[in-house]
Structures are given as structure tokens and as C-alpha cells.
Amino acid sequence: WSDNCREKLLNFVKGNGRSSEIIDLLKGRLDEQNKHPWQSINYLESHDDLAFIDRICSPQDWTDGKPPQRVIKQAKLAMGLLLLSPGIPMIASGQDYLRSKQGVQNTYQRGDLNALDYNQFKETEAFHNWTKSLISLRLSKDGEFFRLSHFMGDDQYISVMGPNNSIAHIILPEKSESCEQILLILVNPSDHEISILLPEICDGKKEHLLIGEKSSRIGVVPSLCLQVWKLT
């Protein structure tokens, strides 16, 4: 289990992390001792310890059965980076709809907190649908580069660290910068829309947004947002 993944991701979406660590995660190389990407079980929460949403905000900050909108966006970013990273992702029961355990770390013998409250699902169904769309992308033909059986070469990645810890991460399916098709992951963990200067390899290609909030143009990323583009 990659505690590294859990801690680095949560720190990143809360504004305390480093973009270089997230780039390593997106390459499947955050845990340096691994010889294969599938040796990492990537997770944000498990059956014990705190629910990941309780580590982003206090349950006392919830209103009308859901956390603040900013916190939901932070959680979406964390879930997106989890499911779009090489390795084996693990999602705990209820995590897909932001199940809270009321900030209690050790819920051993706390059936009242461990039970899944499906009434809450009605309030956070949009997050559940986001999780479903991420899983669908990961399992698709376009998502094969998130399901690696072996590490890709450094020449198959181009990563740009932009302002405010933002990231442009390019995956080249072939070991050539003249690829006809590339994947572009854009990440903005800040509270403001940012613009990232993209590498020349992105110029002149047809753009298709696979997942994420739409923006005025490619390279402009809304606040607390993850986008995946296919460029052909």
C-alpha cells in the first residue's frame, strides 16, 4: 500500500504539496523501490483510519449533507489523480460519494460510523458520477497508459511545472516527439484559473476533452481542476 500516494495527494490538493511529486505519481514512480508500476496500491483511504474527506475538511463545515463546494473540488482533484496514475488504485466503500466518519480516526466497533449512509448519496451523487467517469476513462483504450505493466521511458513523457503548482503532463504513446496522438493531463490545484504554456508538440493538433471541466481554450485550466485531453 502506497502511504506515499495518500499523503502526497492529500497535501497537494490542500496546497501543501509539490508538483514534482505528482508528476512522479503520474509516471508510476512515486515509490522509488518498486520495480514495476503495479507494485503500488494507490489509495486515499481504507476501511480503517480517517475517511479522506475528513482529512480535507472538518465534518462541522458540512451543510445540507455535503461539504463546501471548494472541498468537493479538492476531493475531485485527488480522486482524479488517484485513478489516472499507474499502479493499482483502491477505493474504499463509500469513498465514491464522500462518505464521512465524522472525523473519527479509529472506528473499530463503531458500526454507526462504519455503516454506509445511502441518504448522503443523494447529496453527493455528482462526485459518484465523477468517479464513474474516471474509472471508465481508465478502462478505455485511451486509458491504457494509466494501466501500465512496465515503466515507460522518460522520452515518453513531457512534463511542465506551471504557476501555482500547476502541471501539464504529456504522455507519448510512441518513443517519438512526432506522435500523431498524445494524451495531455492538465492539473490546477490553486483557487484561481491559470494558464500553462504548452510545449510545441501540442500545436496544430485537433483537441478533444476526455474528462474535466471545460475552459475557454486548451492550456487555460479552471481552479482546482483536472483535465485530460486527447490531441490528434
Language-model regions, residue ranges each:
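Conserved alpha/beta catalytic core and glycan-binding cleft of carbohydrate-active enzymes
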Residues: 1-93, 97-102, 176-178, 185-190
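Carbohydrate-interacting/catalytic domains
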Residues: 69-72, 83-232
